[in-house]
Amino acid sequence: VDSVITTARKHDLKIVFLWFGAWKNSMSCYAPLWVKENTKRFPRSLTENSKPLEICTAFSDNLLQADKRAFCELMKHIKAVDSQENTVIMMQVENEIGMLESARDHSPLAEKAYRQPVPASLLKALKLKKKGTWAEVFGTDRYADEKFQAYYYAKYVEQLASAGKAIYNIPMYV
């Protein structure tokens, strides 16, 4: 990180760093080995046929907390070395998140969330009057599954970005 910042300064360039802690191009292949090896602490997403995927579930608080800790340490460091010169102008939080092989996660944690009522804040944002579970409000097709998964990915990334911005308030995007 320091070398990239120093080199950018020498060439009068600005930087947008990319953080891919939990996911990159849908997969969790760049997660640290201690995350990938501990599937009990960091469960994987499952297809509708219970096939495990190399995608950490967005429904794991353990994953979110570990991702936050590491991301916040990075943001502290960037602030310490760059808040005066502002070489780092933006941060991309995660990269191309989504599901492959299945429209949504069917892990036990995801299934529990799927059976819960759709959050009121989402219903309000979508200007929907209907209340109920995800299946009751959106149906049970692939598009409904994608809405469910997109909401929870967005919720995860929003929490991660907010934690980072609380440390060093630079623009962030997905």
Residue ranges with predicted function:
Residues V4, A22, A70-L74:
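Alpha-helical scaffold elements adjacent to nucleotide-binding pockets in ATP/GTP-utilizing enzyme cores
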